[in-house]
Structure formats: structure tokens, C-alpha cells
Amino acid sequence: MASTRDIRRRIKSVKNTRQITKAMELVAASKMKKAQQAALAGRPYAELMARMLAALADRVEEAHHPFLTKREVKTRGIILVTSDKGLAGPLNANLFKVVTDIKTPAKYAVIGRKGAQFIARTHRNLLADFTVTDRVAFAEVKVVAEFMVKQFLEGVVDTVEILWPRFRNTLVQVPTLLPLLPLSSVKDVIADLRSDAGGSAASAPGASDQQMIFEPDAETVLNALLPLYVNREIHQQVLDAKASEHSARMVAMKTAKDNATKLLGDLTLEYNKARQAAITQEILEIAAAQFSS
């Protein structure tokens, strides 16, 4: 049995660990809530863009935009969204499993240090790596979007996809691979935007397409909106990934805190037993000394 001094030292260490994990759990919960609110805040933008694209689609034929041009897929371009830090449970490991299962040639643009380290460690083709703060400012994500669009237009990659941990609920984050480019059609873009807007884009009052005037012409505006759609889509998924990251970290820290509490109880019991044994031993020694005298 360990000495009471060693057990006291372990109890102190576990108490400190429990305090740290509890603080990290609270911080992660706060950040998760903010990330969810930020993701929901993008709904009005998606709604308005869906209305505009619906109005444009009725006025022009399918635009001949490079984003709508399909070609033979030789190299996939994948935006991998991971966390910068660990202590997030299996969040990153689940994403890396999806990457490992990709057998076709692919080049990666990575958001998050953990992803960049994995791509380098496994000797995959890394185009660039980026860092995005917890605020997930649109300007930060726009840099990533413009970089990947450039790779697509120059023929470096034949598709652009994004792999991120989709937020389902506090306990569930699902690795999801979403195609971004080339776009299948304007109608599919509208359907996706309406889905993100909660299905309200088509029926909101005062949303008459006839009130919209497009300058210089409808086709020019449509071609300008498609890159904005790609930027917005990437921004939305990075926000979603941040919510997943903070949620996974909150759950991991809660589990660690609960385990520390259980361990603290076991150590306290062990300490009491050791202390009781030491007292009993002292009593026996005193009694033995009295009998011998």
C-alpha cells in the first residue's frame, strides 16, 4: 500500500486536474453556443441569396460560368477543416479516417494545425494550410475560398470539396464530405440555400421577384453571385466545424472531470484506509511495549 504522503500528493494533483478540466468544459460550452449562434446568423444571407438566384434563374438561361463546367476528374481538391488544438475527443481522428479512405489522387488545403500535421505526417499533397480564429470572420475564410477557386480555374484540381465535422448535436459530430465545385446547376444551388435558410426563402412575405432590378443585366449578376455562394458555403461549414470542435471538447472535458471525481473518491478511500492502518499499527506497537515492560 502507498504511503499516506504519496496518496495526499496524488489527491492534490487530481484536484488540480479536475479544476482545470471543469474550467475548460465551461469555456468550451460558451464557445460552442457562440459558434451555433454565428451559424444561425447566416440564415438571412442564405435566404436573400436564394431569392435573388431564383429571380435570376427565371430571367436567363443556364449561365456559362466556369463554376458550372464539368470536366474529367483527375485530381480532387479537398478543404480539410480540423481543430488547432487537441483535447477534442475523436473529432480529428474521425476526419483523418475519411482522408485515409480516399484512394483517388487528391490535393489538400487545410484549416487547422492538427490537419496540417496529419497531411504532412502521412506524406499527402498539401497545397496550403490556413489558420482561422474562433470568431471565423468572413474575410478569413474568403482567403481559403479564393485560393481553392484559383486552383480549380487553373486546372490544378478538377473538383473542390470540403471535409468537416458536421454538427448534429452536443454528443454527435459527423465527418461530412461535401462537393462544392463544379456546381451541378443553379437550381441545385437555390435548393441548397433554401435548405440552409430553414426553407423560408421561397415563402417569406414581400419577397416578390418582380421587385428586383438587376444591373447591368441579369446574367452578369448571376455570374457574380456564384463565387459569393461558394465563399458563403465554405464560411458556413467552417462555422459548423467550430461548433463541433467546441462541443467535442466540452464533452471530453466533462468526461475527464467526472473521471477525476471518481478517482478522487477512490484515492480518498485509499488514504483513509492507509491512515487507519498506520494508527492501528501505532496502537499495536504501544500495547506491545506496555506488555513487554
Specify the residue positions occupied by each region the protein language model found.
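C-terminal beta-strand-loop-alpha-helix "lid" module of Rossmann-like NAD(P)-dependent dehydrogenases
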Residues: 1-293
